[in-house]
UniProtKB/Swiss-Prot annotation:
Name this polypeptide is given: DNA polymerase epsilon subunit B
Keyword list, A-Z: DNA replication, DNA-binding, Nucleus
Source organism (scientific name): Cryptococcus neoformans var. neoformans serotype D (strain JEC21 / ATCC MYA-565)
Entry keyword DNA-binding: yes
Function: As accessory component of the DNA polymerase epsilon (DNA polymerase II) participates in chromosomal DNA replication.
GO biological process, one term: CMG complex assembly
Superkingdom as given in the UniProt entry: Eukaryota
InterPro entries: DNA_pol_a/d/e_bsu (IPR007185), POLE2 (IPR016266)
Molecular function via GO: DNA binding
More about this protein: In eukaryotes there are five DNA polymerases: alpha, beta, gamma, delta, and epsilon which are responsible for different reactions of DNA synthesis.
Amino acid sequence: MVNQMRSAIVKVFSTKHSLTLPAPALHYIEEVLIENEIPEDEWMVGLEFWAKEYLKAEDSSSLVSLQALKKAYENLQLGTTEDTQVADPSEVNVESHFSVVDSFDMPAMRYDPVRSGFVQSKAQPSVAGQASSRSAFLRERWAIIKEIILRNENFTPPAIGGHDRANYLKLTSIRNLLGRAGQLFLLFGMLARNEEGKLCLEDGESRVVLDMEDAVPGEGLFTEGCMVLIEGEYTVEETVRVLAMGHPPSERRNIARSLHGHVDFLGGGAVSLKEEQKYNPTVLANTQISFVILSDVWLDHPRTMPALRQMFEGYANTAEYRPMVFVLCGNFCQGGWEGQEGLKRYSRGFNSLAELLQSIPLLHSSHFVFVPGPSDPWSSTTLPRPSLPSAFTTRLSNRIPNARFVSNPCRLKYFGMEIVICREDLMGKMMRNLVVVKEGEEMNMKRYLVQTILDQAHLSPLPISVRPTLWEYDHALRLYPMPSAVVLADKYERYELTYEGCHVFNPGKFVGGIGEDGWEFEWSMYYPATGRSERSVLTME
């Protein structure tokens, strides 16, 4: 009987659908047929349904994986095949599709240039980090962006014999420049400094010194650590005379998701594009759902608590439009936490906030997410940085069940959407470390910053000497696939704009200062249904 069963499995999966079944997958199919006591005359029909369900999945391949096979079987059991109609918004529990992701809980997905895909690291990331990982994370960042470039239509070779075959853009590696002085090349690599302090370009294989005298930069901010495209002439001095410099092209979220939709970047299970489309009507129907984002919530400022009370009570009294989540970003103390008095002041601030939130029961159904700022304890200089110490937060956590103290950065997952929250004074750091920037009347530094971050697909495209990062947690700073939205909470003035489908905004400082009508407090509200944010202002005498 076993031989007949195996023959039927091979006939359907291998002969008919040209699928290769490894031993574990074959044994699993046999176990399912035996455990469910499927009659022999129903084997072929059941196996046919199973094979077709497997082939519908986005991560299906000719070599059948046990995980994908199990998922196809579960879909058949639940009746949730890819042909299932869209979900009824009134029947979907929105809360079950919302989660907060800490950077230190994200799976360590590493890019494999051979497979042109992501695989989960077998080793657990370490905060200390091995010496080998210091160079590995830069090579990985370079490889990811290079793959994006080569997929771009301007770099894709036309069909053989096509009229434009000679005109498409071609990258040249730095080591292939030798002996070709006087010729023009298009190079891709990372801006860095050599031992003599000269600006150079590195591509993982070699490096070359750059002559920037005639360089014309494109839009964006160019600093050391950025991956850039350079058009220039190789000279007899073995340098490149740069004619033009630009950021690499970005890749929209839907394109990246179509390629890597089966990869679980955030943990908690991957959401396929078809699953995302299934719940799109639910996201669009819930126009009342919002995320409130505040930054620099100085709990030691005398006017902060009254302003927070008025804001929270205002939201609590509008049940239909009560925010789903409040994200409070640091710094949480204007005067600093150092010293005995500073620690007491910091503790008093969070204790007062705990009492305030407990006094408004209507808000207890909302989530509260706390993201540390650069000056919060214990003043970690690296990204990602851990959550606030429990010594200050235990009282609030005990009183407010939905309070989460997470890393900086962190991410919000809402159905198939991903919202990145990062508290970092990034504009100032980028401006202080500029190598070159395009000048002119239309110069827009806010747009340049957003374009740079998304084109670089990274929250910190700076050298680790300027902005230290945890090498083995670099995946937590990655912006690939491009998120649905990015909150760049910065002490710089607020802004909001959309680039390549990704909405990026800075809510500004909560305590805005004195205006014409009194003290002003500002924050941002993000609406997942529209994918846009808006400014909110509270004025108090």
